[in-house]
């Protein structure tokens, strides 16, 4: 039930910011290995002002993911990014837990009325919904 509450809050935030004409980024852990702080499916929303909701692990990984999300919002693009959580690697984030995660950064434009309408409909019927799927388009497009 806690996960469902969190998912409902995610859609409420997406709807609120879409209706107020603010773009945002959904950051979802798609793969984790080793001793990563959060597993696949963990997500957070990053708003254009740098505010975030939810978590993908906290600390330096979330700090770096927020920086990447803000760049993606500026460039209006979605992308995959690997984060290494052990010392002395190219993408070292200085976290001692050791491991690696891959995160998908899904850009959500306030102009995407289909997505905003889906959020509105989903929330209006939340209590009747038995099974919900949040689909991510993982296609990497070149800019």
At which residue positions do the language-model features occur?
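Segments forming oxygen-rich coordination pockets for charged ligands
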Residues: 2-143
């Amino acid at each position: 039930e806690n996960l469902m509450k969190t998912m409902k809050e995610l859609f409420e935030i997406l709807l609120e910011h879409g209706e107020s004409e603010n773009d945002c980024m959904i950051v979802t852990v798609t793969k984790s290995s080793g001793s990563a702080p959060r597993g696949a499916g963990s997500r957070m929303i990053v708003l254009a002002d740098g505010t975030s909701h939810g978590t993908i692990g906290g600390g330096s990984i979330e700090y770096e993911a927020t920086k990447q999300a803000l760049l993606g919002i500026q460039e209006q693009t979605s992308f995959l990014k690997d984060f290494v959580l052990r010392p002395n690697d190219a993408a070292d984030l200085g976290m001692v837990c050791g491991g690696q995660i891959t995160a998908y950064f899904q850009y959500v434009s306030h102009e995407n009325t289909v997505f905003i309408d889906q959020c509105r409909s989903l929330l209006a019927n939340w209590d009747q919904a038995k099974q919900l799927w949040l689909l991510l388009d993982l296609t990497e497009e070149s800019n």
